[in-house]
Amino acid sequence: MSIPTVKAKLLQGRKGLIVGIANDRSIAWGRARAFRALGAEIAVTYLNDKALPLV
């Protein structure tokens, strides 16, 4: 699935924390991709070390 291209970096200069990424199909993962595409700097947490390869 691709994220639509947005010319404006609406979140440029903003910082965010995305918690609870479980895999590449989770809502948190989708938010992280979208926020990053809009220019935000993000930090993420994930379920556990077993989930790391999926993130």
Swiss-Prot record:
The entry's keywords: Fatty acid biosynthesis, Fatty acid metabolism, Lipid biosynthesis, Lipid metabolism, NAD, Oxidoreductase
Alphabetized GO MF terms: enoyl-[acyl-carrier-protein] reductase (NADH) activity; identical protein binding
One example of a Gene Ontology biological process annotation: fatty acid elongation
Signal peptide: none
Pathway membership, UniProt: Lipid metabolism; fatty acid biosynthesis
Catalytic activity of the protein: a 2,3-saturated acyl-[ACP] + NAD(+) = a (2E)-enoyl-[ACP] + NADH + H(+)
InterPro entries: NAD(P)-bd_dom_sf (IPR036291), SDR_fam (IPR002347)
KW Cytoplasm (keyword) present: no
Top class in the EC scheme: oxidoreductase
Keyword Lipid metabolism found: yes
Cited SUPFAM superfamilies: NAD(P)-binding Rossmann-fold domains
EC number: 1.3.1.9
Residue positions binding NAD(+): 20, 26-27
Assigned protein family: Belongs to the short-chain dehydrogenases/reductases (SDR) family. FabI subfamily.
General function of this protein: Catalyzes the reduction of a carbon-carbon double bond in an enoyl moiety that is covalently linked to an acyl carrier protein (ACP). Involved in the elongation cycle of fatty acid which are used in the lipid metabolism.
Subunit structure: Homotetramer.
Name the UniProt record assigns to this protein: Enoyl-[acyl-carrier-protein] reductase [NADH] FabI
Source taxonomy: Bacteria, Pseudomonadati, Pseudomonadota, Alphaproteobacteria, Hyphomicrobiales
